[in-house]
């Protein structure tokens, strides 16, 4: 990418209400001085558009930049808001990192089963902690639904803010690596429309922040994401050719709530039972 392309993308995303950026230091091979200068300029532009910026790191990145768990002044100099630990530094170091004097949040890898509750018991600063899932560049490498829920429920129980990724379906998108099969967290989301991916993550009730793993998403995709109702589970409906007006009224007239005993196959709402209808719904032949 180029600074000009990045700037145009940030301006567009900002107009649609997006407020968070994820960027990566794992594959940066420039000198520490060049890295600090380049990322400082990027952070300044991102902050100008109102974005909070997270940078992906690991112990090698810390070593390359001359940072330690007790001295992250280089990240503060760059203007980093969130340090994501793709690989953590060790329990004592992680605890110290959460108590840094700059107020930089520490984001742990949610696609691993980490005992962050024990870190908190030992003195980690919960208010300065959050978690973010990985994204996966190759087909069939993403998390299964079962694993995603297992990891996410683990951290949800700790009260930590969680983030996950959806993927743009545009051609020739990219991420930290030159791969073109998308960058979602969940494998089942890889080929879905971007708004359906987001609605899926929101429907789990476990994810707070949703980011696009690859770039550049189209304006149509940004608009579709911005239009997603984050307050409820939403579906797009395809009507049967013989649908009646009574059925449409049942569907749209009520704010439906799923029953607690709903099956694995569909959600059930009992709300329409509270109202009487003078017109019956004709039986259909089973196919």
Residue spans of the language-model regions?
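C-terminal functional modules
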Residues: 240-287
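Active-site mouth loops of central-metabolism enzymes
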Residues: 1-7, 55-66, 180-192
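N-terminal active-site wall of soluble small-molecule enzyme domains
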Residues: 35-81, 92-94
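Short, acidic/polar
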Residues: 2-15, 64-74, 117, 193-200
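Catalytic alpha/beta core domains of metabolic enzymes, predominantly
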Residues: 109-243
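Short, well-ordered coil/turn segments that N-cap beta-strands
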Residues: 17-19, 47-53, 79-81, 102-104, ...
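Catalytic beta/alpha-barrel core
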Residues: 24-27, 32, 56-59, 79-91, ...
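Glycine-rich, proline-tolerant flexible connector loops at the mouths of alpha/beta enzymes
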Residues: 19-42
């Amino acid at each position: 990418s180029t600074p000009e392309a990045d700037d145009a993308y940030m301006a567009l995303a900002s107009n649609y209400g997006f407020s968070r950026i994820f960027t990566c230091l794992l594959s940066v091979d420039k000198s520490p001085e060049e890295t600090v200068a380049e990322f400082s300029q990027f952070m300044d532009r991102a902050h100008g558009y109102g974005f909070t910026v997270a940078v992906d790191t690991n112990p090698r990145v810390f070593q390359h930049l001359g940072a330690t768990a007790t001295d992250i002044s280089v990240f503060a100099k760059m203007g980093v808001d969130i340090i994501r630990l793709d690989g953590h530094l060790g329990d004592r170091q992680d605890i110290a990192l959460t108590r840094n004097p700059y107020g930089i949040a520490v984001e742990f890898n949610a696609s691993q089963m980490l005992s962050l509750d024990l870190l908190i018991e030992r003195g980690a600063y919960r208010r300065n902690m959050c978690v973010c899932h990985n994204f996966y560049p190759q087909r069939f490498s993403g998390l299964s639904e079962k694993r995603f829920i297992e990891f996410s429920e683990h951290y949800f129980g700790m009260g930590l803010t969680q983030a996950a990724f959806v993927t743009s379906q545009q051609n020739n998108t990219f991420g930290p690596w030159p791969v073109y099969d998308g960058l979602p967290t969940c494998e089942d989301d890889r080929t879905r429309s971007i708004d359906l991916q987001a609605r899926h993550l929101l429907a789990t009730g476990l994810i707070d922040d949703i980011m696009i793993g690859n770039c550049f998403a189209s304006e149509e995709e940004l608009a579709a994401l911005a239009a997603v109702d984050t307050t409820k589970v939403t579906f797009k409906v395809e009507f049967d050719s013989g649908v009646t007006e009574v059925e449409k009224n049942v569907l749209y007239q009520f704010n439906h709530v799923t029953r607690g005993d709903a099956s694995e196959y569909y959600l059930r709402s009992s709300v329409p039972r509270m109202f009487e209808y003078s017109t019956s719904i004709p039986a259909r032949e089973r196919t």
